Amino acid sequence: MDAGSLDRLVQFQRATITDNGLSQVETFTAHGFPVWARKTDISDGERFRAGEVAANITTRFVVRWSYFTRDMTPKDRLTCEGRTFDISGIKEPEGRRQWLEITAAARAD
C-alpha cells in the first residue's frame, strides 16, 4: 500500500465523562487532528431489534502508524464523511509500525 491511497479524512473521537449534577454523562469529543485514511466498506446488513429495523455497515480504515494512532482503542470512535463509526478492532496488517487497520461499524440509515 502507498500513501497515495489515503484519500479520506477521519476524525477520531474520545469519550469524556462529565457530571451534569444529576448523573455522569459520557460525551464524545474530537481527539487530535484529522488523519488521512483509506476507506473500504466490507459488509452491510439489516437487523431487527426491539421493533425497529436498523441498517448497518462495517468498514475498514487504514491509517499510517504513529504514536497518536497507535493510542486508539475500541473505546474510541471515528467520523468520516459525516458518519460516526464505532471501532471494533485495530491491528497492524503488514510490516512493523507502517500502517494500522481499523475495523469499525456504523448505522447506515
Please describe what each predicted stretch is:
Residues 4, 25-109:
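Short, conserved turn/kink motifs that form compact alpha/beta structural patches or helix kinks used as
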Residues 1-25:
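Active-site-proximal polar cores
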